[in-house]
Amino acid sequence: MRIDVLSIFPEYLQPLNLSLIGKAVTDGVLHLAVTDPRDFTTDRHRTVDDTPYGGGAGMVMKPEPWTLALESVVRAGGDAAASSCARTAPEAPEAPETAVPAVVTNPAQTTEPGAATSSFTVGKHSAAPVLVVPSPAGEVFTQRIAYELAAEEHLIFACGRYEGIDERFIDNARTEVRVRPLSLGDYVLNGGEVAVLAMVEAVTRLIPGVIGNPESLAEESHTGGLLEYPVYTKPAVWRERAVPEILLSGHHGRIERWRRDQQLSRTAQRRPDMILALDPTQLDRADLAVLAETGFHVTGGSWRRDGGHAATEGTPDMA
């Protein structure tokens, strides 16, 4: 996978050098680069923002520098895909492998500043990249979306600042890439970099070869629509608090049932909306019994909460 990040604060993305993501880049599993839209400006102050039309507080990111930066990374991704296809063709000689630095800062465009630019095109050897625009106005980012993005070949993240990026940048980008505005949640950050750090980590850890033990992904929170069960390690007794006896029994079937029960009860307590999103027909009798103890019941194929009122996914009863 190739990931490009557009940001006027490239140093903000340096944590991506660390841990498993940094190792994945070093090992060639992932290509990660950061591009600064300021490198595509034409004035000596490298201006990337201006006052909003219609008045109002704050500044708005100008569309031209961001579009030029986007064009550059789309072209780079298309060239890389074409080169990869050429290397795998039978008549082509095998190219030597080269190490990829953890976070690359892309150079500015090779054309003269202010020169006319033509509309960029996606390389025919790969699908159109996905442009993720972090925004409080976007769709809420979830584990399901992380899995969807992990299946893509090329992701581009545009880290807006201030009041956001001129909407014409997004409208123009839709003619060449697949645009996906995403939000971490119902709150506002100073810029998109923090959101991108979270999204990139959530996505890349799902790529084969990034996580050492793939089985760990199958037991995490949100996998299967439930939160993860509690975990424990040595010592068996710590400050007079003992590990649940069932985990010391060695009885794998009972341990699996205990963990499932913990997932259900924890999710019902902390995220009742996730229980409401479950298909009751996919739960066994033991599952339904645990949920009944937490106040969730199935009547006529629909969820009901204690208190006699119906509960639907769209209007969860957040106790």
Task: Describe the predicted segments one by one.
Residues 1, 84-85, 90, 101-106, ...:
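SAM-dependent methyltransferases
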Residues 1-76, 80, 104-107, 254-268, ...:
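N-terminal nucleotide/polyanion-binding subdomain common to many enzyme families
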Residues 4-6, 33-35, 132, 155-157, ...:
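Hydrophobic/aromatic beta-strand patches that form the interior of the parallel beta-sheet core
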Residues 36-47, 143-149, 174-175:
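Short, hydrophobic/aliphatic alpha-helical segments
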Residues 56, 160, 251:
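Conserved RecA-like P-loop NTPase ATPase core
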Residues 62-161, 208:
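S-adenosyl-L-methionine/SAH cofactor-binding core of RNA-modifying enzymes
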Residues 165, 169-222:
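Structured adenosyl-cofactor binding patch, chiefly the S-adenosyl-L-methionine
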Residues 182, 205-209, 214-246, 257, ...:
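Surface-exposed, charge/polar-rich loops and edge strands
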